[in-house]
Amino acid sequence: MAQNNEQQQQGQGLIEAGVLDDIINRLLEFRNARTVRQVQLSEAEIRSLCSASREIFLQQPNLLDLKPPIKICGDIHGQYGDLLRLFEYGGFPPEANYLFLGDYVDRGKQSLETICLLLAYKIKYPENFFLLRGNHECASINRIYGFYDECKRRFNVKLWKCFTECFNCLPVAALIDEKILCMHGGLSPVLTNLDQIRNLPRPTDVPDSGLLCDLLWSDPSREVKGWGMNDRGVSYTFGPDKVAEFLMQHDMDLVCRAHQVVEDGYEFFAERQLVTIFSAPNYCGEFDNAGAMMSVDESLMCSFQILKPTDRKPRFL
C-alpha cells in the first residue's frame, strides 16, 4: 500500500485527490444515458491532467513490466460512448487492471472526453492502469485527423500543444509476465534486444523511420515473408516467419497489438502467435466491426470480451 500511496502522490502533487475525483465523476455522469453528451471540464483541469500524467509516464519505464490479471484494449479513436461500454463490461477501474494500446484520439467525435478519462484513471491508479502510445498520439498525425480541430473548437490551440507534450512522454511497449509483448503497431527489423525499447529517449516526437516509428506503425501481412513495404507509406509489414523468429529468440508466447480494424474486434495471425485487438465498434460509423478487449488471467490464458456493433440504432445518412 505504501508504494501505491507514494506513486499516487507523485501524480497528484499536481492535482488534488478531491479535484481528480470530481473530474472523474463528471466524465462518468452520462455513462447510463442513451447518448453520451459533452462533458464540461475547464481548461485548467485538462492542463493539470496532462502535466500530472506526464510526470507519471516519465517515472515509469518506456517498456512497462506488467503482471496479470489484466485487460488489454486496442484503438478507441474518440468513441467515448464505446470506451464507457468497455468499462461497463470489464469493470470500472480499479475493479480490473487495464492496458490500452494507443490511438485514443482522432476520427471519433469525443477525443477530449476519451483522453481525459484515460489520463485521470492513470493518475488515480498509476500501478493498475496503463496507457501506451499509438501512432495518433503524435502532433503531425492528430493535427490532421480531428484532434487538433476538436481542441481548437472547444478550447484553443495551446491546449492541443499541452496534449502533444503529454503524448511525447507515453511509454511505447509493455511486457506481461515476460511472455506477452504489447505495442500499438508491431515488430521492427532493427529490434534485437528489449533494452533498445527501454533506452528510447523521452520526451520525443515520433520519427519517420527507425525503432519507435516501427513499434507504432508496422503491420503483419500474410502476403509477406520477412519484411515488406507498407501500404501506409510508413514503416514495414512483416510475415508470420518474423513473428515466430522473434518469439523464439526472446522466449515469449505472444505479440499483442492494435492499429488495424478487424471485423470481430480481435484477429489471430501466424498460428496464434500474434493477435490484433481493436476496441472501437462501428468504427467511424463506416465499418460494421465489433470491438474487443482481451483478458489475460494469472496463468496467461487469454479470453475475449466482445462489444457487438449492432447495439446501435441504424444510421441514416
From Swiss-Prot:
It is an enzyme of class 3 (hydrolase). Binds 2 manganese ions per subunit. PROSITE patterns: SER_THR_PHOSPHATASE. The active site is at H136 (proton donor). Mn(2+) 2 binds at D103, N135, H184, H259. One of its GO terms (molecular function) is metal ion binding. Its cofactor is Mn(2+). Gene3D superfamilies: 3.60.21.10. GO terms for cellular component: cytoplasm; nucleus. InterPro entries: Calcineurin-like_PHP_ApaH (IPR004843), Metallo-depent_PP-like (IPR029052), PP1_catalytic_subunit (IPR050341), Ser/Thr-sp_prot-phosphatase (IPR006186), STPPase_N (IPR031675). The keyword Manganese applies. Keywords: Hydrolase, Manganese, Metal-binding, Protein phosphatase. Mn(2+) 1 binds at D75, H77, D103. It catalyses: O-phospho-L-seryl-[protein] + H2O = L-seryl-[protein] + phosphate; O-phospho-L-threonyl-[protein] + H2O = L-threonyl-[protein] + phosphate. Its EC number is 3.1.3.16. It comes from the Eukaryota. Belongs to the PPP phosphatase family. PP-1 subfamily. This is Serine/threonine-protein phosphatase PP1 isozyme 1. It comes from Nicotiana tabacum (Common tobacco).
